[in-house]
Amino acid sequence: MAPTSSKSSPRFDRTSAAILDAAAKVFSEEGTSANLATVAVTAGISRATLYRYYANREALLEALTADALDAVARRLADAGLERATVEDAIERVLRAFVAVGDRYAVLTGDQTTLEAAHGELAAPLHDLLARGIRTGVLRDDLPVEILYEFLAATILKAIKLNQRHRLGLEEASAAAARFFLDGTRARD
């Protein structure tokens, strides 16, 4: 979680945000066992400042996880999935995840954390996939859980392509949506 402190100043919030941004970048590139000194340098702060905000790696990872889940959940809520066509909603889902790629990619490094993240984010995606099957857009020979696994894998690949600057946000989202839909679209 974010540090709990009586310090509610904008400076405190900016420093906390800088630390989380730096941690997301460093951890997505080097893994969650990366040296915290690297996180501090990337954030433009001293190690002592880092430890004032987050007492240890676990506290930093917990805060980063909460931040990532909040960011993706906000984007999914704002995406209007229930009002969009299934195809458009899938592209919006991909765009939401790719847009917070570094933060979400960190979650994927730890299976327990990833399962917790998917637990919180799965419901709207399961609903979308079930709607796709029900309306005949998505194939009905695969259960929602399997389609969800394929979608999750597609999300991760789109994030990686964007992080490596192989594709921009919009390109990665659109290409991944086409890839997913081409494989899961209902057959005539």
Task: Please give the residue ranges for each predicted region.
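Short hydrophobic/aromatic patch on the recognition helix
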Residues: 44-54
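Helix-turn-helix/winged-helix DNA-binding modules
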Residues: 31-32, 52, 139
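Hydrophobic/aromatic-rich alpha-helical bundle segments in the mid-to-C-terminal region
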Residues: 105-115, 119, 134-179, 187-188
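Alpha-helical DNA-contacting segments of helix-turn-helix folds
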Residues: 54, 61-68, 108
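Short, flexible, glycine-rich and Lys/Arg-enriched loop motifs at helix boundaries
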Residues: 27-37, 104-115
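Basic, helix-initiating cap at the start of DNA-binding domains
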Residues: 1-42, 59-62
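Amphipathic alpha-helical interaction segments
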Residues: 18, 38, 88-92, 96, ...
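Hydrophobic alpha-helical connector segments
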Residues: 63, 70-103, 113-114, 123, ...
